[in-house]
Amino acid sequence: MTSPRLDVAIFSYNRGAYLKNCVDSLQRNMPGIGWTVYDDGSDEPDTVAYLQSLGERVLHMKSVGEDRHGGYYNNMQAALDGSQADYLLMLQDDLQVVRPFAQEDLSRIDQVFDQSPTTVFISPLFLKGSKRAYFQQRYQPDAGLRCYRWSADPEETGKVPQKYADIAVLHVARLRQSGWQFAGSEEGNGALADRLFGDMVQAAEPWVFYVPEEPAYRGRVLTFGAKLAVKMSGNTVKSFKDMTAQASLAFAQRDLSV
């Protein structure tokens, strides 16, 4: 049986050091996985220099107009349209792959999609400790498939993350068959996914997380808070130590009901 193909799309804008940390972590922990950077017209010199060093790994996109998200969702659509993989992992430049991603991880993704025919999104993200109560109130473990499924009150109106999140593993064929076109916001995509698909699944062994204190952009402009944070603590990437292979194995064998 042929193993499914997983590729990675990384979306970047003017955060060269963060992009390098993301790419380096991907190469360490997901060797052999194909990846492409979709850059939204970066013009910061260090970022441009790093992008040039990646050569053909980079697709230089350019957003149009004054969209507060730049060309992010257009670039996500371009990645989906151009993908030749079965599954596509969408990342941003401020994310890090924090543990080794093994063949068993890909097999679990494949099993979830195979046994959940209305599922098109799987979250690869570790959750912040501050959201522990939120998670425990809204998810139940599926021990057979090693994942968590949404089980909150059906009257909840928000569809992020019940149906969709920007950072996810996508089932390429199902999205194409539905005629999926990314909306211009995470909330808009959540509403669209609510009409078309079942709930998003949370991986029980996530492998991706946001690095802390990253500079944030709104409408291609660095936010005031981000400028203040850079001034106070510098612009050095505060990256994570990778989880060891031994720790990853113990993580994958833990009791999900605890």
Regions found by a protein language model. Give the residues of each.
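C-terminal catalytic/acceptor-binding lobe
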Residues: 164-173, 177-258
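N-proximal low-complexity "stem/linker" segments adjacent to membrane-targeting elements
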Residues: 1-24
